[in-house]
């Protein structure tokens, strides 16, 4: 799938030391939302910071999920393991890497 215009939600969370596994279990939603096309999780080398990147079909689909009870429950489950959280919502595109 080509992403000429993507809607991208990026969250960064600093975790309490030693809580990565518990956080990972809490982070996974009980159901994946309609409109989410892709999702990635990236951890720092020490496991104390996680970046979540999700690609959405529209700004509206992301907003529906953000305001949903599924997301509210997920956030409540993650809260005991999170020290700090930052988030941003962006539009972007996939860059083509030239063949070598």
Predicted regions and their residues:
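Short S/T/G/P-rich N-terminal loop/turn motif that feeds into the first structured element of a domain
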Residues: 1-100
